[in-house]
C-alpha cells in the first residue's frame, strides 16, 4: 500500500518520541520532515542524524521546504495557541492534521473507540494523556450499560509533566471531562490529574469509576478486558493493575455524589498503569508515551481513510 508523507511540528519530547515511533515503522505513513524553532534542539539533531529533513524556522520554514508539496498530514506537538495558526495555514493547503495540543479544533479521537474513519474530517484532536488512558474504559462500560456518571483520576510523575501540562491543568480537566461524555458515552464526566513528586519516578496510574444502570457484571468485565487488549495493540505497557471491582447500590442505600445527586445502580472501578515503551522518553513517562502511540495510530487511520477516498 502507498504511504502518505507526514511532518512533525514540534521537536520537543513529544515530537521526538513520535518521530522515533514513526521511524520504527508504519504501513501508512512516511516521515518527511521535522519542524522546530530552536536550531540547537536535540530533537532536530536526532532527526538529521536519521536522515529526516528538518527546519528550525517553524511553520514558515516547513512551507518553504521542497518536501512540503508532497506532505499530506502533519502532527502538531506544539501548543494550543500555535496550533490554531498552524491549522489555518495547513487547511489552506489541503493538509490533514493530528493535533496533540489542547486546541481541540477537530473532533476528539481515541483510536480503539472512534478511529478517524470519517473522510470529511481533516483535523483530529488527541484529547489528553489522561483521556487516552481512561476513556477507552468508560467506553467499554458504555458498550454494555448506560453510564450515568464517570470519574477518572490520572496520576503521573512530576518529572514527566512539562511546563505545558503544568500551565494547563484546568484545560486538561475540562478537555478530558468533555471527551468522557462525547467519546466515552457517559452522561456526566469528571477528570482529576495528580502530579506525583515521588522519587524514583512512578509510572502513570489511572483510576476509573463508572456509575451505570444495573447490568451483569461479567458483561462489564469482559468488555473492559477486550478494550484493554485493543489499547495494548499499540501501547504494550497498558495494563490492569488489579481485578475489576463492582459495588451495587439499591434504593435502600443510594450513593450520594456531590453535584450529581443520589445514584442507584452498578459502580465499576478499574485500576490501570501505563508504562512507556522507552523509545525516547523514560519508561515512567507512560502518560506521554500513550499520547504519541495514540497519535501514530490515529494518524495512520486518518491517512488510510483519505488515501482510500482519493483512490475511489
From Swiss-Prot:
NAD(+) binds at residues 11-14, 160-168, 287. Its EC number is 1.2.1.10. Pfam families: AcetDehyd-dimer (PF09290). The active site is at 129 (acyl-thioester intermediate). SMART domains: Semialdhyde_dh. The keyword Oxidoreductase applies. SUPFAM superfamilies: Glyceraldehyde-3-phosphate dehydrogenase-like, C-terminal domain, NAD(P)-binding Rossmann-fold domains. It is an enzyme of class 1 (oxidoreductase). GO terms for biological process: catabolic process. This is Acetaldehyde dehydrogenase 2. It comes from Novosphingobium aromaticivorans (strain ATCC 700278 / DSM 12444 / CCUG 56034 / CIP 105152 / NBRC 16084 / F199). The lineage of its organism: Bacteria, Pseudomonadati, Pseudomonadota, Alphaproteobacteria, Sphingomonadales.
Amino acid at each position: 500500500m502507498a504511504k502518505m508523507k507526514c511532518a512533525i511540528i514540534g521537536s520537543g519530547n513529544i515530537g521526538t518520541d513520535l518521530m522515533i515511533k514513526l521511524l520504527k515503522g508504519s504501513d501508512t505513513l512516511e516521515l518527511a520532515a521535522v519542524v522546530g524553532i530552536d536550531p540547537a534542539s536535540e530533537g532536530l539533531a536526532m532527526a538529521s542524524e536519521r536522515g529526516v529533513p528538518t527546519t528550525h524556522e517553524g511553520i514558515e520554514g516547513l512551507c518553504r521546504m521542497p518536501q512540503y508539496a508532497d506532505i499530506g498530514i502533519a502532527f502538531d506537538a506544539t501548543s494550543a495557541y500555535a496550533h490554531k495558526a498552524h491549522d489555518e495555514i495547513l487547511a489552506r493547503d489541503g493538509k490533514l492534521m493530528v493535533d496533540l495540543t489542547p486546541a481541540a479544533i477537530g473532533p476528539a479521537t481515541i483510536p480503539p473507540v472512534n478511529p478517524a474513519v470519517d473522510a470529511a474530517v481533516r483535523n483530529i484532536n488527541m484529547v489528553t494523556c489522561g483521556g487516552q488512558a481512561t476513556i477507552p474504559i468508560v467506553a467499554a462500560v458504555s458498550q454494555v450499560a448506560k453510564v450515568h456518571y464517570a470519574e477518572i483520576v490520572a496520576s503521573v510523575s512530576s518529572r514527566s509533566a512539562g511546563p505545558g501540562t503544568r500551565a494547563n491543568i484546568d484545560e486538561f480537566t475540562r478537555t478530558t471531562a468533555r471527551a468522557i461524555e462525547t467519546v466515552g458515552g457517559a452522561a456526566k464526566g469528571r477528570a482529576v490529574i495528580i502530579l506525583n513528586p515521588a522519587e524514583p519516578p512512578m509510572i502513570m496510574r489511572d483510576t476509573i469509576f463508572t456509575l451505570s444502570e444495573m447490568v451483569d457484571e461479567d458483561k462489564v468485565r469482559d468488555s473492559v478486558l477486550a478494550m484493554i487488549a485493543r489499547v495494548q495493540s499499540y501501547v504494550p505497557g497498558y495494563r490492569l493493575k488489579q481485578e475489576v471491582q463492582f459495588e451495587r447500590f439499591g434504593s435502600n442505600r443510594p450513593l450520594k455524589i456531590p453535584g450529581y445527586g443520589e445514584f442507584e445502580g452498578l459502580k465499576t472501578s478499574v485500576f490501570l498503569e501505563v508504562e512507556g515503551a522507552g523509545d525516547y522518553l523514560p519508561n515512567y513517562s507512560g502518560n506521554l508515551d500513550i499520547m504519541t502511540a495514540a497519535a501514530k495510530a490515529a494518524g495512520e487511520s486518518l491517512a488510510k481513510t483519505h488515501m482510500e477516498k482519493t483512490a475511489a
